[in-house]
């Protein structure tokens, strides 16, 4: 919704000034550079297995809510053809995910809150290496919509080594997105919405550090698979 409102407002502004074609030769450059700032919503998809502890407890994990993070990238754009560009935009994504652990087998008489539910705040600082193919429509006055698709390498450099669930530092993601080039007098503004889907199971099942701590190990034992997902809203300045 936010992306649609911002895009409509910027497009309307560009159309109000469409009698003059801004930056007419911007798309003719073989290579150009830029940067972006934006926000991201990080999520993980958790597959629970119904593991039961020696005490008869069954825990499951979920991410019930999401909070926005911040992202910044630099951009190198290579023109392949009239409507095709290859874009490399390394950067950093900052965000967090709160995982809730619920004891679904806790009887009503259990009053200790830690026997009913716990939580884990997973803070992430991602170094990202996205490579995207940009497929653009023909320019209409001062706007030009486009779609993107690509892959993105992800490396988390802010891991807490004592987490209940420990996630791998590296991941690979498929990305699809949409946006619009808006040609302003001095630069091109490109709001873009991108969806990122993790390709690997990032859960680290081998936890020798928790062999003597079954109270912590039960959370890892209760989960079979964890995959990363993200929604990213960025504003490119080119």
Regions found by a protein language model. Give the residues of each.
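Outer-membrane beta-barrel channels and translocator barrels
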Residues: 28, 81-83, 138-142, 183-187, ...
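Residues that define the transmembrane beta-barrel architecture of outer-membrane proteins
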Residues: 29-31, 66-70, 123-129, 143, ...
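Transmembrane beta-strands of outer-membrane beta-barrel pores
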Residues: 39-43, 92-96, 135-137, 151-157, ...
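Predominantly the C-terminal beta-signal and adjacent terminal strand-loop region
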Residues: 185-238
């Amino acid at each position: 919704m936010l992306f649609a409102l911002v895009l409509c407002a910027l497009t309307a502004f560009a159309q109000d000034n469409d009698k003059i074609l801004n930056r007419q030769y911007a798309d003719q450059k073989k290579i150009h550079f830029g940067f972006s700032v934006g926000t991201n919503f990080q999520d993980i998809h958790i597959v629970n297995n119904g593991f039961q502890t020696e005490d008869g407890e069954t825990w499951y994990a979920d991410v019930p809510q999401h909070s926005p993070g911040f992202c910044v990238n630099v951009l190198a754009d290579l023109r392949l053809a009239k409507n095709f560009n290859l874009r490399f935009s390394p950067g950093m994504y900052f965000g967090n995910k709160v995982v809730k652990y619920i004891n679904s087998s806790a009887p009503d008489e259990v009053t200790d809150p830690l026997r009913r539910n716990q939580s884990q705040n997973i803070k992430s600082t991602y170094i990202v290496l996205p490579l995207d193919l940009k497929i653009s429509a023909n320019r209409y006055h001062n706007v030009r919509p486009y779609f993107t698709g690509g892959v993105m390498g992800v490396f988390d450099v802010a891991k807490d080594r004592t987490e209940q669930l420990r996630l791998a530092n590296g991941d690979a993601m498929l990305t699809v997105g949409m946006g619009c080039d808006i040609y302003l007098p001095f630069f091109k503004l490109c709001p873009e919405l991108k969806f990122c889907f993790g390709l690997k199971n990032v859960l680290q099942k081998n936890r020798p550090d928790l062999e003597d701590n079954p109270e912590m190990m039960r959370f890892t034992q209760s989960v079979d698979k964890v995959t990363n997902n993200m929604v990213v809203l960025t504003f490119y300045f080119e």
